[in-house]
């Protein structure tokens, strides 16, 4: 009934946690015998003209590699799948009784980005926009340069950590561009951040230092 209501009321866009378009694998990953049925629901939404923001939480050895290629092939064929985001699974120490999961490393994260880039190029040629994006964390793990803000279009998957780095950098650059260079009494500022965001905060802190003589930013 809920599916019919969404279609009838044309609730759009909607967010869909896809993870994989392989029905058997989705049942295994979700530990739900009905989990494979969501794929036919996605097809119904697409046929009804409902825009889809799709998320793929990737687990190394499960739904990355060839399975990721399969999922992106299926999703990129849907005209109304307007954004597809791949994000890495978060692994904590509290996994007693659960499936053993590995975290992504430099090599496996880089492999995901390569696949994403290929399908993004395909989508850009077919639809005029990239549609397929990797979360910022993949670039950090792979030690690769983050794309520019222009790469992310309308930033449809910010809540999934896609393009947050590029957007923040652009917002700081735009704000500084509208600010006159100033000088004044020496001033020291301390900024605390996490390990993943450290390079970004250092880079924007340097931009601020260049704009304001006498400013010293220390990032921890």
Which ranges hold each PLM region?
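Auxiliary Fe-S-binding modules of radical SAM enzymes
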Residues: 76, 83-85, 90-220
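Conserved Radical SAM active-site core
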Residues: 1-79, 90-119
């Amino acid at each position: 009934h809920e599916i019919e209501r969404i279609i009838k009321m044309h609730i759009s866009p909607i967010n869909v946690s896809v993870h994989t378009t392989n029905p058997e694998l989705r049942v295994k990953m979700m530990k739900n015998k009905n989990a494979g049925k969501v794929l036919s629901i996605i097809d119904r939404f697409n046929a009804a003209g409902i825009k889809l923001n799709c998320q793929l939480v990737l687990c190394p050895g499960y739904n990355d590699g060839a399975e990721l290629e399969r999922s992106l092939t299926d999703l990129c064929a849907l005209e109304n799948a307007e954004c597809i985001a791949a994000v890495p699974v978060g692994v904590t120490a509290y996994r007693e009784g659960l499936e053993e999961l590995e975290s992504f490393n430099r090599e496996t994260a880089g492999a995901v980005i390569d696949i994403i880039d290929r399908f993004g190029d395909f989508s850009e040629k077919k639809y005029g926009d990239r549609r397929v994006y990797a979360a910022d964390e993949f670039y950090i793990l792979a030690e690769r340069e983050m794309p520019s803000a222009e790469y992310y279009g309308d930033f449809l998957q910010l809540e999934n950590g896609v393009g947050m780095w590029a957007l923040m950098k652009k917002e700081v650059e735009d704000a500084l561009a509208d600010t006159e260079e100033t000088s004044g009494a020496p001033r020291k500022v301390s900024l605390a951040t996490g390990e993943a965001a450290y390079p970004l905060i250092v880079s924007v802190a340097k931009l601020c230092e260049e704009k304001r003589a006498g400013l010293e930013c220390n990032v921890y």
